[in-house]
Amino acid sequence: QQYTSTVITRYFNYCINERKHPDHGIIGGYLFYDRIIKNYLAAYLSVLQETHYPVSLSDFYFHGRHFSEKQLPVFSYISDCILAHNIWKQSEETRKLYEYYNLSTALGETYKILTICDNPLLYILAIADTLEPIKAYEKINPKTVSESINIEYMPGSRKLTFSSSNNAVDISELHRRAKGLEGWTSAHCTEITGGAFTLCL
């Protein structure tokens, strides 16, 4: 677990009070866990209605799908990653506010840098959310963005190379975001060379 429930609650309050909107990542994380547990219980109740023998809540099948209590920690882990990937590391501008809301684990000197080895899913969510081209170029037509940005991956290399195939989309904006990852993840970004840059994961 990247953050305690107390820190998550404090950050949520910080977002509502200071950023003037609830954090969608925190809401999404809690909703994911809530819905998937309800789905688990609904499947179990349906099995009870359809069968005439005892069924264990900890391990059962419903419509060919296996439900097991061993899946619950996985659900919890996924939920935690969704929650945590949207909790931002403190910047110089937000330091006093973070201290006010007692967000000690998100302060610069105590923040735990995200790595792919320590927490693969959280790391991938952080990278994908930061470098999502449609979000990065929200003022440009999504179709134009999708047709302009090229992302190359060499299997086994942990490297992504980004480039733009035309002048409609300036690759420097995506590069700026990629460089920003260096402050809170273990990712390393090269400079732009020949209209392309590489992100080392």
Over which residues does each language-model region extend?
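C-terminal effector/catalytic modules and regulatory tails appended to multi-domain proteins
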Residues: A128-L131, K135-L201
